[in-house]
């Protein structure tokens, strides 16, 4: 009887020891089988196409939480190391810079970084470009001739353009454009331009609304990204048939190409799977979706081709802007001073 008791106690103790050692491994295994969580500020349809392709190719499941650049970037900063997110995807790079400055990103795997063209990834390697879009001046073909178009984004500060053009100043897209202006021309020139914009521009709630304003003739032109036009043309064209695109080129601030970014959170419990996701998005599978899909954003992978309807990246003559230098906080402060926010 005593032997039985000893055996039972020994067995329980042995089980307890094994359980104690097995628990961390069990937790890791559970974390590896759970879906990775992506905080997504990119267009939901594009990210869903990436998620579908990634899960099909790897078997790794993904949960997506959608929001805006500013909303999710600030949420990550507030959550800090307690964030449940594994990956952050944005439309524009200032939100990536915000999270990076808070020290919340893990280094991106080198074999992912080397898939992406130089200039579409920051030098610190803590996030990487996943797509890009270019600034354009969408104009009403019935109200402006090519000879009447502004030669530079800066020309729109001229009183001659008063109430003739528009933009969506509250959106992350325009704030990224203003951030590029700040990086290229400096604070004084940017502040002056934004104050002139307050006097001259018609403010819209969103880039689609601004393009509709151009198409209807409410305004003659608007500063937007190119994919709004191409997306509408691919559908019905009802919001863009009277519209054409003017590319500023010549390294002008109005030729700014904005980088959409992706990064893995340092606090991720599924870091390996998160890194695999980022590698897939920047690799052939993810970049081919940009070429064949209906997002009309530019591919940034080395050797990757963009949608053939787009003006090639090499022909845009974009200014050289380090995506990690775009200062969203300073731009928002300048826009508030100008009365735009």
Provide a role label for each language-model segment:
Residues 41-48, 67-71, 77, 84-219, ...:
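Extracytoplasmic ligand-binding site segments that recognize negatively charged/polar headgroups
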